[in-house]
Regions:
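Glycine-rich His-Gly loop
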Residues: 19-22, 88, 206
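Active-site signature of alpha/beta-hydrolase-fold catalytic machinery across serine-
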Residues: 32, 76, 96-100
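Conserved HGGG/HGGXW glycine-rich cap/lid loop of the alpha/beta-hydrolase fold
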Residues: 2-59
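Conserved serine/cysteine hydrolase catalytic core
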Residues: 163-223, 228-231
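Active-site loop/oxyanion-hole signature of alpha/beta-hydrolase fold enzymes
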Residues: 35, 44-85, 89, 249
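Flexible "cap/lid" loop of the alpha/beta hydrolase fold
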Residues: 95-136, 183
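Conserved alpha/beta-hydrolase catalytic His-Asp/Glu region
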Residues: 122, 139-178
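Catalytic histidine-centered segment of alpha/beta-hydrolase-like enzymes
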Residues: 232-245
Length: 249
């Protein structure tokens, strides 16, 4: 697909895999996990629009929202049953794909899928409202600082200036995705949706991640027919990077 940077870590051609990354990052961070999988799957990962080496996100007035656009891009790379892996926002896209086409999923690995609608959390909703207000007021640096304090591998002020600029330029995408994540605009949680996923599902969480992460995992697991859960000791939200060995298993 034009304008989308695809990355590839060759492996078993009979086990195609697709990995979907989180916001404010790129598909390159799957390299650590791909290396530890030692070719067990043929893994691909694309940079989300506005991230990494993909084109900037430029929504059309009558076009899809960001979450829908990412879902369509991901679906375009699936032509047979796939081992689907998603982290954070990528996890919600993976879950959306699995609900829409369960027959296309060989296995589903969800690493802290941030589908906040699955576990209503007043603190998290207040955080999203605060970030929206900061962004609307033009305080992108403070919005990025608030976001990274909870979800980042390190604090905003610990990042080099180039990375801080990267965060500021893209932080508005966090607010833009709030309806998809907090209100389930894609209707992922519709009756019978999660229950239709017949592939084995593994939900991985960082032990030290925000409480809402564990509440979401519990709510999703309660409805999935074939599900396992794993908690990585000492890990937080960016565990695919900080704890690649444990995540790869």
């Amino acid at each position: 697909m034009s304008g989308v940077r695809m990355r590839h870590w060759p492996g078993n051609p009979e086990r195609p895999g697709l990995a979907l990354h989180c916001m404010l990052a790129s598909g390159s961070y799957w390299a650590g996990i791909a290396g530890r999988l030692d070719g067990r799957i043929d893994l691909r990962a694309f940079d989300l629009p506005g991230h990494g080496q993909s084109d900037d996100w430029s929504p059309a007035p009558d076009g899809p929202d960001y979450h829908t656009a990412v879902t369509r891009i991901a679906a375009s790379f699936i032509d047979r049953p796939v081992d689907l892996i998603g982290h954070s926002l990528g996890g919600t896209v993976a879950l959306r794909l699995a609900v829409a086409a369960p027959e296309a999923i060989r296995s589903l690995t969800l690493i802290e899928p941030v589908l906040f609608a699955a576990a209503r959390d007043d603190e998290q909703r207040a955080l999203h409202e605060q970030m929206g207000e900061l962004i609307a007021a033009g305080h992108s640096d403070q919005a990025a600082r608030v976001f990274m304090a909870i979800w980042g591998a390190q604090g905003y002020d610990d990042l080099p200036p180039r990375m801080q600029q990267h965060m500021r330029d893209r932080i508005s995408l966090i607010a833009e995705n709030s309806p998809a994540l907090s209100d389930d605009r894609a209707n992922i949680l519709r009756p019978g949706g999660l229950e239709s996923i017949t592939a084995p599902v593994l939900i991985i969480s960082g032990q030290d991640s925000p409480p809402v992460v564990h509440a979401i995992a519990e709510a999703l697991a309660a409805r999935l027919p074939d599900v396992g859960r794993a908690s990585v000791p000492g890990a937080r939200h960016m565990l695919p990077i900080t704890h690649a060995d444990q995540v790869a298993g």
